[in-house]
């Protein structure tokens, strides 16, 4: 959620930055007008309340003096009615302001490239060289079916499209991957957490999914619960409405959880394979940091995600998202895209973002600065470390052999009882 004070005092700059995210300046101008109307009305209400208090004191004094108070009581009743009406008007203006502030995206950091969509993202660096096969590379969904480790047909029968069963060595591979990821993040100082897989609406508001992106989620009817779209939601809301000791920062959390997404608007995209599912596992990283340290922490978090890909020896590139392609809550985002041979392209496998104080303001997560004792909003960061299903896809395709088998990356073999190859039966 944006800071109204910043919009008031730095309107032109904020409007210019939000315009790069598709926000019409007229929308901000309307918001500014409503805010001024509210502040002017608030002054009037306070003046009337002060006047009412004065009249109330005069009535009390008149009663002590046994004087007639009818006129003063009538005046106070009139003032009370005016205050009540103005309070109702204030409530309406507050609702309008809330609608604005909760649906406007975050202000992009100065270092974010300006652009309309993913075509204007900027490549930062590459690691590894895409493997050139001397045979025709298979897609991971064909490899998974041929090896009898992934079953989409029965996933569709049991549930529907974009669901699958991992079975046998496929299930073991997935488990090996996320255990490896969690162990690596643990070495970097992250505290491992097992979160609830359902959260309430306040939590969804805190991280920015609600109210704007309700259509992307699975709500449990007749309850206040939502299936989590990412562990970012419960991890970030862990400290909702709390004040932390500044000496404890930064705090690092990591969690593996299922993620549930309706994929609204994705009809026809990635209809086969592990890239876009309604339910998938993901290892998440979340940080709570002081504002002056948050961008250094973003670089570290991105490096933590890169470390996983490097140890798996999967070629990838890092991309800085442009203003038009960033997520709603992000002030700056790096995407990690892994090489997918059958598609002859890089595909997103991680997204690491600094939301600055955007989520902290919504969730009221603050810290007491040990330097001056003041309570301040902290910065929150989140990143995938990594999307597990997409990592399975990348391993199957990059480690495939001409005979249809798949070599297990060396770092995963201890998690699979020393197994080196998944071979056709």
Swiss-Prot record:
Reaction equations catalysed: tRNA(Ser) + L-serine + ATP = L-seryl-tRNA(Ser) + AMP + diphosphate + H(+); tRNA(Sec) + L-serine + ATP = L-seryl-tRNA(Sec) + AMP + diphosphate + H(+)
GO cellular component: cytoplasm
GO biological process: selenocysteine biosynthetic process; seryl-tRNA aminoacylation
Pathway assigned to this chain's UniProt record: Aminoacyl-tRNA biosynthesis; selenocysteinyl-tRNA(Sec) biosynthesis; L-seryl-tRNA(Sec) from L-serine and tRNA(Sec): step 1/1
E.C. no: 6.1.1.11
Enzyme class: ligase
PANTHER family: SERINE--TRNA LIGASE, SERYL-TRNA SYNTHETASE
Function: Catalyzes the attachment of serine to tRNA(Ser). Is also able to aminoacylate tRNA(Sec) with serine, to form the misacylated tRNA L-seryl-tRNA(Sec), which will be further converted into selenocysteinyl-tRNA(Sec).
Name of the protein in its database record: Serine--tRNA ligase
Source organism phylogeny: Bacteria, Bacillati, Bacillota, Bacilli, Lactobacillales
